[in-house]
Swiss-Prot record:
<dbReference type="GO" id="GO:0009523">
    <property type="term" value="C:photosystem II"/>
</dbReference>
<dbReference type="GO" id="GO:0009535">
    <property type="term" value="C:chloroplast thylakoid membrane"/>
</dbReference>
<keyword id="KW-0602">Photosynthesis</keyword>
<keyword id="KW-0472">Membrane</keyword>
<keyword id="KW-0793">Thylakoid</keyword>
<dbReference type="InterPro" id="IPR038676">
    <property type="entry name" value="Psb28_c1_sf"/>
</dbReference>
<keyword id="KW-0934">Plastid</keyword>
<keyword id="KW-0604">Photosystem II</keyword>
<protein>
    <recommendedName>
        <fullName>Photosystem II reaction center Psb28 protein</fullName>
    </recommendedName>
</protein>
<dbReference type="GO" id="GO:0015979">
    <property type="term" value="P:photosynthesis"/>
</dbReference>
<keyword id="KW-0150">Chloroplast</keyword>
<comment type="subunit">
    <text>Part of the photosystem II complex.</text>
</comment>
<dbReference type="Pfam" id="PF03912">
    <property type="entry name" value="Psb28"/>
</dbReference>
<comment type="similarity">
    <text>Belongs to the Psb28 family.</text>
</comment>
<dbReference type="InterPro" id="IPR005610">
    <property type="entry name" value="PSII_Psb28_class-1"/>
</dbReference>
């Protein structure tokens, strides 16, 4: 099962919008994951301490991909969204990310399409 976490051990329930860019030679690129009202904010508003957001972790049966490039957006002083940027450095990294995205979409009964 493919899952996304911001705090290790706690699955994010909000499904992100994922925007992909790719270099002309197809070897490098960027994946931007945007989460509106992610459930991780609900954890931080509770009285229990679940820990800090330390990155975004993409986990599936092949292992884990991660990025520390995670930012929170606030509206009127309240957390509203999280955006994470995952850099793809080579063709095998691109292929691996696409396998994760396809597994994640399948697990969530969604489909992937090119725009």
């Amino acid at each position: 099962m493919a899952k996304i976490q911001f705090i290790k051990g706690i699955d994010e329930q909000t499904v992100p919008e994922i925007r992909l860019t790719r270099s002309r030679d197809g070897n490098t690129g960027t994946a931007i994951f945007s989460f509106i009202n992610p459930t991780v904010f609900l954890l931080h508003s509770s009285s229990q301490n679940y820990g800090e957001i330390t990155g975004m972790y993409l986990q599936d049966d092949e292992g884990e991909l991660s990025t520390r490039n995670v930012t929170a957006n606030f509206v009127n002083g309240k957390p509203k969204a999280v955006e994470a940027v995952y850099l793809i450095r080579n063709k095998s990294g691109w292929d691996r990310l696409m396998r994760f995205i396809n597994k994640y979409a399948e697990d969530k009964n969604m489909s992937f399409y090119k725009s």
